[in-house]
Amino acid sequence: MIRLFAVIIVLLPRLVWASDGSCERIVSLAPSVTEVLYDVDLGERVVGVTRYCRYPEAAQKLPKIGGFYDMSVESIVALKPTLVVALAEHESVRRSLENLGVSTLAVDHTTPKGIKESFQKLGARCGVETEAAARVEALERREAALRFADRVVPPLRALVVVGRANEGSPTSSIYVSGNDGFYSGILELLGVLNVNNDATMTLPTLSPEGLLALKPDVILEVVGKDDPAVTTDRKQLWARYPQLPAVRNNRILVVDYRFWVE
């Protein structure tokens, strides 16, 4: 208890600046949050990000506060933020920061609706309503274009791969988006079914038999950047399974993970 009290006393002078909730010094707790901040011209106010925040390039040069699951409250506090922007999944970290007097803002990036609302929240909080409104309008135009695109009946079935631990195998340690993820919202707009009706999961090994059982009509690979070499590599990996409807009909789509907001 005495040690905790001593730590609080040391931190108190640093926390005076956190009470007004301004946006002069912002720390981002997720790559998607960092992108939104830069999209509404708040990039110059960002003073800390996670080690996974790679876009835009300027964010890579900022101090790091940890990763998605190993964030350091001490590192965040040391940056003297006037606002910390977190995802809903960061509730425990957010509570710790609030208890120390650090202002936070939670946003939801699991759905297209949540992303639009995050622009609006940041716009209102940080006085960039015009920039935020422009981004929301652009997203709504994109939604409308998807919603009114020609639908296929019966609907296509899509396998959405959002990451992979083994770049040399199409079926080893892949991360598959489920019904709880952002991409399910996109598929719904398109009138496409997700072959994974469960939560987003890691598949340590997806056997050829298991893959064939899923019968995806479309395979959507989400990658870190738009690179023709990566696109070619992914398509060559999946070409090993010509029995799949998606491969047979050349429906392997490789997209930059920012395709929705650009």
What function would you assign to each model-found segment?
Residues 1-4:
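Positively charged n-region of N-terminal signal peptides that target proteins for export
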Residues 13-18:
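N-terminal signal peptide c-region/cleavage motif recognized by signal peptidases
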Residues 24-37, 131-190:
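Basic- and aromatic-lined ligand-binding clefts that recognize polyanionic substrates
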Residues 24-25, 116-117, 121-124, 133, ...:
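Structured C-terminal subdomain patch of bacterial secreted/periplasmic proteins
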Residues 24-93, 175, 192-195:
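A short, structured surface patch at a secondary-structure boundary
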Residues 50, 177-203, 223, 249:
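His/Asp/Glu-enriched short active-site or ligand-binding loop at hydrolase and phosphoryl-transfer sites
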Residues 55, 94, 98-125:
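Flexible loop/hinge segments that line or gate small-molecule binding clefts
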Residues 73-80, 99-100, 206-215:
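Short helices/loops that flank or line small-molecule/ion binding pockets
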